[in-house]
Each structure stands twice: as C-alpha cells, then as structure tokens.
C-alpha cells in the first residue's frame, strides 16, 4: 500500500482526534479551505468547527491561544502555513511553551505540536525558504522532528501528539505529494531513534527530511565507484540518536553530514562536535558537512539550485573523506 506524506499526516491527526477528544487543530485556513496544502482535508466535516479552528492571519495570536489551551490540559496541533511565519509566534514558542514546565517545577505541562513546512520549496524566495531546524533545536524544552517517509511522518506525528512536551514538527512542502510504501498498521515511532536506510562499510552519511532523497540517489551513484555508504535518516533532531551515529562511525571511520540549512551553528556542526568528542580515535578523515550556502535563498531558479546542497556536492564530500581521486 502507498500513501502520500500529506495523507500520512492527516491520518495521524484523525486517529488521535478520534482517540482523544482533547486534541484539536488550529491555524490559518485549516478548516473551510482544508489546509493550505490540504493536510487537514476532511477534518472539519468529521470533527466540526470547535476542534478544527480557522484563525485570522495572526500567528502571534493563535499560537498564544494554543499554548494557553495546552497549559489548561488540551492538546493543540498548531499549523503554520510555513515556519517562516512562525517567527511571529517565536515568543510564545520559546518563552512560554518551552519554558513553563521547567519554571513551574513540573506542575504545568505543555502538550502541543507546532507543525508545517520548513525550508525551501520551489522559487518562493528568501522570506519563505528559510530552514529553522537548527534554530529550534537550540532551544531547551523543545523536541524537534524532521521526517522523510510517509510512515515516519505518521508514526512520529502520533508520538508528537501524545507527548506532554512541545514538539516542533518540521515538514517539507515538496514532500507532501510524494508517495511511499507503508505497512497496513503504523504504530507510534519513538523519538531519538534514527533509521539506518542502508548499511555500508566505507563511509557514514547522516541526514534528515528531504535531503534523505538526495542522499539515497548519491548512495546508488557511489556504489558504481565501489564506495559502500551507510545511510542514516535521523528522523528526530532533538533528542538526537547519538548512539546510532557513533556506532556507525566506529564501523566506517568516516562521516559526511548533509543538511539543507546553513553551515554556521547548524545541525551538522553539532553532530560533528559530538562525534569528535565521542569517536575521534575512530576517524580516518576529517568530518565533512554538506549544507546550504550562507546566503538568503534566491528566487531565480538557476541561483536557487546553486544555494542548495546538490548531488555533486555530496559526491565530492564523500570522495574527499574516502581519499578517492575525483
């Protein structure tokens, strides 16, 4: 059976809304319009306007309302049309949702999911293309999820909705329409559990979200050059499955990290720091990070491609750590 990422997310929300009457969806155009990307299609008809709530165009307003509802014991799912717009709600996310459980001595929980597309799509320019994975991962009190496959989107969304802590659920606009094989029943997937998509012996490639597709393509290309790659899909950025990364590096002795976001203070830099501390003696080459260029993402299609990680960038990085003649 195949389903799209869009359908996987919808199924997860529907199942949890049926299971727990405290779960509700709130955001711009999630009800009457059925979601900017049709992720919430059909939920209004099934659950009504008290549990699928359209809002004015004010992320600061509806995010704050949802955080308050979570403090009161409900389980909101907040849809941002894009995480670029979530900057308007940053205060509520960082200073209220992420901090209150700690500051209340554990007396006040905040079971809330903030979800929506993150990163580049296709020619939506600099203000709609930013990648916030590293930004949210930097904040104590937030859990950060960035899946690739439909099964992982559903399984991790089930876990996110049931979690008593705020979860940043980072999707990708381009992936919404992608279809994947899925089992008949998808169970909740625990956080902090990476997936090894391919085992290998020469080099470890670590990535997440839509960059998994790029890495899968490159792994097949490099196989023709007798470079055997191990590919790890992180799925959860925070908490991070450090053990899977370290064990893989101990086996392959080389590491390349791929992320769409910027290099400086990025996810890749954090992983590299951990590996240097925990597995330095196992490394046969310096760690390579393939990332987006340190520029606002251009609108022009030719420049947009140059600013994003490419297959050639990854191939070059892998061959470099393998001391392969390029």
From Swiss-Prot:
**Record-linked SMART domains:** Transket_pyr
Report a single Gene Ontology molecular function.
pyruvate dehydrogenase (acetyl-transferring) activity
- Output one GO BP term: pyruvate decarboxylation to acetyl-CoA
For the ligand (thiamine diphosphate), the binding residues are 59
Catalytic activity reads: N(6)-[(R)-lipoyl]-L-lysyl-[protein] + pyruvate + H(+) = N(6)-[(R)-S(8)-acetyldihydrolipoyl]-L-lysyl-[protein] + CO2
Enzyme Commission numbers on file = 1.2.4.1
Swiss-Prot/TrEMBL keywords: Oxidoreductase, Pyruvate, Thiamine pyrophosphate
Output the CDD domains linked to this UniProt entry: TPP_PYR_E1-PDHc-beta_like
Cofactor(s) required, per the database record:
thiamine diphosphate
Against InterPro entries, the record matches this protein to: PDHB_mito-type, THDP-binding, Transketo_C/PFOR_II, Transketolase-like_Pyr-bd, Transketolase_C
What NCBIfam families does the database record attribute to this sequence?
PRK09212.1, PRK11892.1
Outline what the protein does.
The pyruvate dehydrogenase complex catalyzes the overall conversion of pyruvate to acetyl-CoA and CO(2). It contains multiple copies of three enzymatic components: pyruvate dehydrogenase (E1), dihydrolipoamide acetyltransferase (E2) and lipoamide dehydrogenase (E3).
Q: How does it assemble?
A: Heterodimer of an alpha and a beta chain.
- The name of this protein is Pyruvate dehydrogenase E1 component subunit beta
